[in-house]
Amino acid sequence: MVGLTGDDSAAVELVPSLMAFRAEPGLPDIQVRVEWTDELTPASGLQLFDSGALWRLYECEAGFQFDFRAPVFGDEPYKRLLVNRDFSRATLQMSAEVSGAFPYAAPLDYPVDELLIMHRLTQEKAIELHGCGIVRADGTGNLFVGHSGAGKSTTTRLWMEREDVEILSDDRIIVRRDEGCQDDRAQKQVPPLRFANGRNDKVFMRNDKPSTRNYNASIRNDKSNMRMYGTPWHGEAAYGSPGSARLGSIFVLEHGAGNVLTRLSASQAVAELFARSFVPFHRHEYVESALEFLQELVSAVPCYRYAFEPDGGAVERVLELCD
């Protein structure tokens, strides 16, 4: 859970894509305090990373400093995130000048929200993957991962045309160990993130809501203790749900002929998933944590390379495997 606090309603304003993830107040995993400042002084710490576009990362006394820039706001940072080393407490400083001239610059707009969660996941047994999560009517959860252009949005549309499915996201999925894997679906699952509001206004974002699909059917793979969660960060098909589902199978998408499925070895699966993950590469311990979790993931969930054609036969081939 991410708790967002501030002295007025503007401090906890959510962009539309986050509204479905709003939650009631509770004990946050990440507490963020929003402040407005007249001046964001130049960064003085060691630069750790430069995204080449929207943000730069520095070391600071508290832990880490993220400076965010955008051409429309000029050359200087328009917001700054100061966060401790375990990503549990942060201060988000907003330029009062920019906020006054551009009121649509909300505190948790992209990429602040995703960077917070991506880094927090390094402290837990969890990872964000570049993929689409599809939940069938019987509760079966399948994850289709792929680089940009590999066919995630196409896969989403093919499944929606074929049967009644729930799309958790068509571009970003979080996977974590299901701490309540033997419990009934109605049991509260441990979420990877949530965001909350009030005053000292708070806004939470959450995605711990189980899918509305039939849970009992989704536990046919008794070995799987992994769960996938929707996120607000969608692709061209624009699907982002706060739902979650037990993860049954993972498919690494690539364009091909004949809709060919090939079971991957554990080492192959780890390499393929790591190449399609969102991991902070600026610290070796974050990379090591991600690799350790991926090893656990592929030992629990079968992974396949899927060379597919963009037609209904691609769905039928997966159904043959899963049914």
Name every feature range the model reports, one short phrase each.
Residues 177-227:
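Intrinsic disorder/low-complexity segments
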Residues 150-152:
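Conserved glycine(s) of the Walker
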Residues 155:
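Hydrophobic positions on the alpha1 helix immediately C-terminal to the Walker A/P-loop
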